[in-house]
């Protein structure tokens, strides 16, 4: 469906590496395969040879040579200029748990917010799940007016593994509005902004 589109952007601060500025485009699949070989505390070192045009990924005794993609064939994501009416910041573990609970009942989750609370709700054919956070339980809450929007858990649930280890996740949305999720990890070395289009009644 056209309303299921999603976008991601990640920024890694230059304090995490030593290099001369260059632009390299890689297939995420290949990086994921390499990362999967390591333990949580392992480091991957990347070295790019401009003469050969080959990037070497080193993990312990493993060296993998990767041929980068042609940058001219890559279209960078266009971040939408959206005016979000509501913003909520909460602990990553709490948000992760609410998504996992929601998935036990259905495929679509409703986020609703007003000046006093943020609610995660799923209504299934026989069961329902509601997770409510009062403003005092949230790290921050900004809301001009009550808003509600529905999103697919197909895209949200895989992120719950990431959210569980985060100190905070910032959500921004409005009535039947795209969802923006912003978070940082590794002590702020990397910042991610993820956009997910809403599911509206005409989609169902």
Report each predicted region and the residues it spans.
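Internal, conserved structured core segments that host functional sites
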Residues: 50-83
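Short, surface-exposed beta-strand-loop junctions and turns on beta-sheet-rich folds
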Residues: 13, 62-64, 125-129, 186-190
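A short, sequence-level motif marking secondary-structure junctions
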Residues: 10-14, 67-74, 134-138, 197-201
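Beta-strand residues in well-ordered beta-sheet regions across diverse protein folds
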Residues: 56-58, 112, 121-123, 172, ...
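Single conserved hydrophobic/aromatic residue that forms the stacking wall/gate
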Residues: 1-12
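Short terminal or interdomain "cap/linker" segment that borders an active site or interface and mediates
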Residues: 118-120, 178-204
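Short helix-loop boundary/capping segments
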Residues: 117, 124-126, 133
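DNA replication sliding-clamp ring fold and its partner-interaction surfaces
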Residues: 13-49, 79-114, 119, 135-176, ...
């Amino acid at each position: 469906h056209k309303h299921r589109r999603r976008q991601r952007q990640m920024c890694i601060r230059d304090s995490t590496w030593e290099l001369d500025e260059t632009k390299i485009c890689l297939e995420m699949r290949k990086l994921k395969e390499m990362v999967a070989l390591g333990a949580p505390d392992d480091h991957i070192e990347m070295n790019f040879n401009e003469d050969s045009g080959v990037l070497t990924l080193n993990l312990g005794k493993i060296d993998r040579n990767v041929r980068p993609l042609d940058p001219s064939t890559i279209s960078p994501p266009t971040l939408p200029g959206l005016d979000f009416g509501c913003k909520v910041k909460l602990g990553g573990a709490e948000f992760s748990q609410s998504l996992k609970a929601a998935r036990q009942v259905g495929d679509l989750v409703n986020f609703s917010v007003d000046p006093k609370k943020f609610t995660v709700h799923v209504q299934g054919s026989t069961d329902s799940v509601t997770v409510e956070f009062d403003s005092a339980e949230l790290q921050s809450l900004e809301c001009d007016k009550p808003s509600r929007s529905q999103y697919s858990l197909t895209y949200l649930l895989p992120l719950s593994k990431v959210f569980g280890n985060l100190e905070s996740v910032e959500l921004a949305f409005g009535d039947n509005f795209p969802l923006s999720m912003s978070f940082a990890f590794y002590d702020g070395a990397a910042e991610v902004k993820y956009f997910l289009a809403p599911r509206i009644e005409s989609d169902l």
